[in-house]
């Protein structure tokens, strides 16, 4: 689905990613793990066009989209959800869902909203509430639901369970699995709870100092000695 080749990127003159090569497989969950400051979130931002790319390629559907701006990537059915959630606080939940389908015709938007509400029934009783009044979990449900309305093919999630209770975080993980299994979404995940994220994933990458330290199936990463050291809080990764 997405192939990253020799990617070097950062912010202005500050380079964060160095010679990154990765393959995000279609219809799979791929999790990126690593210590704080290793470039995980920057990797997602770079794929969506929010950083400066010095060199390298991002191949999507046989085209290099490295220089394509974010609004065009959204039209290409690539969705990026930062930790802060992409919701409009002054609009209702229902209005947010409708806006998410702005590039679709009216009948298609209605159909996609019904699909989103089937995955996130928690939103049904709060459709008339302003998004700014929602809890953290409700905002996350809304942001992910908006991606479904948009009919996204690729969904990039940056720490979707941050500041949520363990119980609610598990609900989010279950929703991610459902979006892959029932709708074939390609999902790229950065998550604080790296172990749990890998447990629901197909593949994974570990970043250290802006480089891919190792990659493999989720099971291979979970059993890798370096990941075990990282999980135990050992800094010498």
Curated annotation (Swiss-Prot):
Keywords: Amino-acid transport, ATP-binding, Nucleotide-binding, Transport. ATP binds at residues 34-41. Residues 2-234 form the ABC transporter domain. GO terms for molecular function: ATP binding; ATP hydrolysis activity. CDD domains: ABC_TM1139_LivF_branched. Pfam families: ABC_tran. InterPro entries: AAA+_ATPase (IPR003593), ABC_transporter-like_ATP-bd (IPR003439), BCAA_Transport_ATP-bd_LivF (IPR052156), P-loop_NTPase (IPR027417). GO terms for biological process: branched-chain amino acid transport; L-amino acid transport. Probable component of a branched-chain amino-acid transport system. Belongs to the ABC transporter superfamily. This is Probable branched-chain amino acid transport ATP-binding protein LivF. It comes from Methanocaldococcus jannaschii (strain ATCC 43067 / DSM 2661 / JAL-1 / JCM 10045 / NBRC 100440) (Methanococcus jannaschii). The lineage of its organism: Archaea, Methanobacteriati, Methanobacteriota, Methanomada group, Methanococci.
